Amino acid sequence: MPIAERRTLLYNPPLSQHEAKTNMSINLFGRVIEDNDQTRARREHLERIQALVGNAYPNKFSRTSLTGSAEGEDTITSVVRAFEKHAPELKEGERPTPEQLEAANAELSRYVVRVSGRLATPPRVMGKAAFVHLSDGRERLQIYVRRQEAVAISNDSDQSVEETESGWKLFQLLDHGDFIGVEGAVFITKTGELSVHVSTIQFLSKALQPMPDKLHGINDPEIRQRQRYADLIASSLKVETGDEPQTEGTERELSTREVFVRRSKLITAMRRHLDEHGYIEVETPMLSPIASGAAARPFKTHHNALDIDLYLRIAPELYLKRLLVGGFERVYELNRNFRNEGISARHNPEFTMLEFYTAYKDVNWMMDFCEEMLRETVQAVHGSLQLQFDGEVIDFSWVERLSMKEAIIRHQSPAWSMLDSEYFEGDWIEDPR
């Protein structure tokens, strides 16, 4: 049995009617490869590629390090941002003059790069030349192959380079979504696009499933939420048409990848602020014999070796307070909690929560500290304390303080007018500022 077919059977187990209805994980993640014309064509391409290159799933690909990127090697993004400054400045629809091309390529021809990425577009074979765009999820870079020129196939990133014209054959077997690595000189095409003139190509991995629609992405919110890997692929491949609706005064919608990156920056900024103010990060038990720390229904499990029931924690509060008793004056934990309750687009049964405790301080000090952390985090993530959301500008340079009573009365519905009565008296806090 061919390798591709064996892999298909492993990824595509038969489902019973009961499994299809009840087992969401199997239904969503088990049947990865559907049997249709497109997947059969991709499996056929994989078998032909294996016959051509031998190992169709190599362990590594060595990239150059000319651009001084944070990764320490050249990525698609670092190459585009390092060399696009050499491209002529053109208006929309305008092409560079021969003089502009000659000047730009005289400078760029000195640079030979090795980069790798996913095919962001289907290969375009135009007579004796072919083009395709590689993507690393952030930027795209066009690569160019000429049929008359020998394109070497690299079977290994460091050695065993076969100097033949088989590279052209390999290029014709590539599908949208495949991963490849290429080596070649950087240049500007006649249309003014930064490209790599390929001299060596290495096949890295085959995409056995067709890629999402590059114009519309994935519109089903259920699929986007449950299959984030597919959503990430779709958002990185999506083409901006200029027709996307955008409300005046609002920022464009972030891509899925940008949301991941901003969340990472947010977590890093919060940790940095706490660390710089003397807090110690700790990890407290996820499994507890008693569900405590909040009024919520817990997830229950059983420890076989100890033969006891345990609960996934709903909050780390009690364990953090024990550390205060033990002598730590400032502790925090940024970790997962689990609450076996409702689920919606805004509420997940498992979620990340920051909880921290400080000895010898009162509520006013804590409010000051939280405001400072909020401002530093927004500045680190957004680059400004003012940002646009839902048509309005939110200014984090100052945060209004309200008592619980004031907040409820200000935002209550008419049916809750009784709250502003003798039955709801007293302020919880006073703003000393």
For every predicted segment, state its role.
Residues 6-7:
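Basic polycationic patches enriched in arginine
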Residues 11-12, 16-433:
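Class II aminoacyl-tRNA synthetase catalytic cores and aaRS-like
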